[in-house]
């Protein structure tokens, strides 16, 4: 039965295990929500605004179905966009987006209809009637979200995180420090960003010393607002020792507008990653590394819509073990590090790294891997090579508040089924299975990130 009680649960032990974890609170250490939207607490106007307006998963699949861009990110009305989505939605079967959006519809709206061209109008009208009462803060409480960490630039004032402590009840909203723009000396706009950091923190960032001082001040500012982790997007990690004089020369050259060599770019990035590690060591933050996303791969999309619009891909030609070796050994026993990989063929590398370094953790199945298939493969492999007990928990990685419940439910069902299979095969006792699914679903990530 579609989305029935046994959805994704194929054995009796799995049903029992899921029933024990399904109502646990949600702790999400990595997502892309905007704290401003939560603080302002404005209800959504329609189902497209909730499900499609910010979700590049939806955009990509609509494009795959031949839908014109004007019905995705263009000038068409939200209703026209929803109707266009519903028309092709049956083609989404097998993709987790099909299940997530139906779970949203069934669990949050209590509308148990299958999305199609025939039901699109009814769903539009029914959701429109219910949305005025479904504010962001109410939804977070209804979904039992206990803690969530947004992803924020070091230049941010964090004013909405500060306000959230005053006006948001029952949910803790924390920032995450993401200094990618500081490190990416090869990207357009780097100098302007460095100058902005100088203005924000009162430092002369034309010098390396001034820039590092601004970053330290930013780090402290985030700490004061409850930050517990940093996050770093790395296509291919390449961290090694770089002398500060070398980094200073590259910084000054880049700031003056001169073109850098690839070696200079690599050296600067390696140097900065070590500085970020030292900062996190001071505050005992968790360091999250998201590895392997080749971003903005489709040029025409990036030129017209910018980043995070559905033009990113996965690639497996990465030297992860070699690139991380210096960083991991430099901070061995000094940092908690969580590794996420986009290509599943890299899972053996990070799982065995975690096995070798007690303070390294394998992150949740990420992005293209957060489907039932990807999750099952991820969990089974991790259990067989490292410790499933030590998985860094589930992250929604979402830009869409409504999906917190559906993404978490899917993960907990898959987890329960994987562990339930072990019980049914006689591999583990039910008592240990119960403790395992509870730890991975809630206790483990809460302890790792939020102590």
Swiss-Prot record:
It catalyses: D-glucuronate = D-fructuronate; aldehydo-D-galacturonate = keto-D-tagaturonate. Keywords: Isomerase. SUPFAM superfamilies: Metallo-dependent hydrolases (SSF51556). Pfam families: UxaC (PF02614). One of its GO terms (biological process) is D-galacturonate catabolic process. InterPro entries: Metal_Hydrolase, Uronate_isomerase. The keyword DNA damage does not apply. Disulfide bonds: none annotated. It comes from the Bacteria. Pathway: Carbohydrate metabolism; pentose and glucuronate interconversion. One of its GO terms (molecular function) is glucuronate isomerase activity. Its EC number is 5.3.1.12. Belongs to the metallo-dependent hydrolases superfamily. Uronate isomerase family. This is Uronate isomerase. It comes from Thermotoga sp. (strain RQ2). The gene is uxaC.
């Amino acid at each position: 039965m579609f989305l029935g009680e046994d959805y994704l649960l194929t054995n009796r032990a799995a049903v029992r295990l899921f029933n024990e974890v399904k109502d646990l609170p949600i702790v999400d250490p990595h997502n892309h929500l905007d704290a401003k939207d939560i603080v302002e607490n404005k209800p959504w106007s329609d189902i497209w605004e909730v499900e499609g307006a910010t979700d590049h998963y939806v955009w990509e699949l609509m494009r795959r179905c031949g839908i014109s861009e004007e019905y995705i990110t263009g000038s068409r009305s939200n209703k026209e966009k929803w109707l266009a989505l519903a028309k092709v939605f049956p083609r989404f079967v097998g993709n987790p987006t099909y299940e997530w959006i139906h779970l949203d519809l069934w669990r949050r709206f209590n509308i148990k209809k299958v999305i199609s061209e025939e039901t699109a109008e009814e769903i539009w009208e029914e959701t429109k009637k219910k949305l005025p009462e479904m504010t962001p803060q109410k939804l977070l409480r209804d979904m039992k979200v206990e803690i969530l960490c947004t992803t924020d630039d070091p230049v941010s004032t964090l004013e909405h995180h500060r306000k959230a402590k005053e006006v948001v009840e029952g949910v803790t909203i924390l920032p995450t420090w993401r200094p990618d723009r500081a490190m990416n000396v090869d990207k357009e706009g780097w100098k302007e960003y460095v100058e902005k950091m100088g203005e924000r923190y009162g430092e002369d960032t034309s010098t390396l010393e001034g820039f590092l001082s601004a970053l330290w001040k930013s780090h402290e500012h985030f700490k004061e607002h409850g930050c517990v982790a940093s996050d770093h997007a790395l296509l291919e990690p390449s961290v090694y020792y770089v002398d500060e004089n070398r980094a200073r020369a590259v910084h000054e050259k880049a700031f003056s507008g001169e073109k850098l060599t690839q070696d200079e770019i690599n050296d600067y990035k390696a140097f900065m990653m070590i500085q970020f590690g030292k900062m996190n060591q001071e505050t005992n933050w968790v360091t999250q590394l998201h590895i392997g996303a080749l971003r903005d791969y489709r040029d025409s999309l990036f030129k017209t819509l910018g980043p995070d619009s559905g033009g990113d891909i996965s690639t497996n030609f990465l030297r992860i073990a070699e690139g991380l070796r210096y960083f991991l050994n430099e901070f061995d026993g000094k940092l908690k590090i969580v590794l996420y990989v986009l290509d599943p063929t890299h899972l053996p590398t990070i799982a065995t790294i975690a096995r070798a370094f007690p303070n390294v953790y394998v992150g949740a199945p990420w992005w293209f891997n957060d489907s039932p298939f990807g999750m099952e493969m991820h969990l089974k492999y991790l259990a067989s090579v490292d410790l499933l007990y030590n998985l860094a928990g589930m992250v929604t990685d979402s830009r869409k508040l409504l999906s917190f419940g559906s993404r978490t439910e899917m993960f907990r069902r898959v987890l329960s089924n994987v562990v339930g299979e072990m019980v049914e095969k006689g591999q583990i006792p039910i008592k240990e299975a119960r403790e395992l699914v509870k730890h991975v679903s809630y206790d483990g990530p809460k302890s790792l990130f939020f102590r």
